[in-house]
Amino acid sequence: EESYLFSTVAHKVSAFSAAHPEAKVLRMGIGDVTLPLAPAVVAAMQKAVSELGKKETFRGYGPEQGYDFLRESIQGYYARHGIALDANEIFISDGAKSDLGNILDIFDTDNTVLIPDPVYPVYVDTNVMAGRKIVFADANAENGFLPMPDESVNADIIYICSPNNPTGAAYSAEQLQAWVDYARAHGAVILYDAAYKCFVSEKGLARSIYETKGAKECAIEFCSFSKTAGFTGTRCGYTVVPNDLKFDGISCNKLWLRRQTTKFNGVPYIVQRGA
């Protein structure tokens, strides 16, 4: 019956501030940006606006999967980090949050979901709303806030957020390999939230789950421009669904493409140019 956590916190803060205007509130709810968009982003968006105002360069409906120029740019980013992706494996979204919830449309409601605790509340709320069984993996001081696979637990869908929201703990490539091996052995799919990957600076820590062997057969990766470029209000992200990933013998890439073309009209051209 409660609303979404960050929405509830925002309403409570607003009510308190209205009743106590003299109080200085330290906001511990959703993490928002504090700096404006970069000049290069603003210039690209301004140019895109001008294009839409001219008959020769006007654009209507865009491709649901995203414009080629952005998908190919993301493809190049992964290539520079040693990860080869096909452009058709990249789906442009209006942010990681949307896709983290919407991706569940391609999975059955009788799937068991494994979620680390504590973690980003979207994972829990979307599955509670769908009626799925949830199993929690404790992230605590004893395990460095990085729970590892438990062979006694069977799950169909596994959420991993690294670096983690809210703890900041990040998995090494070696630790992620253990999760990939577990998922492949159990026929599970990993939903890997890489929204905070730009903050990884220590050697040995993974920025992408595709740095591990076999991940393309069991993992979907979600990324966001909110943390890398301050797009919390502009809204843009992307999701990688490998062609090699199959769940119960069915291509997740094809299922997600069908879902997106049916329920999503794509991210605005102006925003994608900025991204």
Q: Residue ranges of each PLM-predicted region?
A:
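Proline-centered loop/turn at the N-terminus of a beta-strand
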Residues: K24, T112, K133, D156, ...
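Conserved core of the PLP fold type I
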Residues: E56-D181, K197-T212
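Short catalytic/ligand-binding loop motif for oxyanion handling, primarily in non-cytosolic enzymes
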Residues: T34-A38, P166-A169, C198-F199, A229-T232
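N-terminal small-domain helix-loop-helix segment of the aminotransferase-like
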Residues: E2-D94, N102
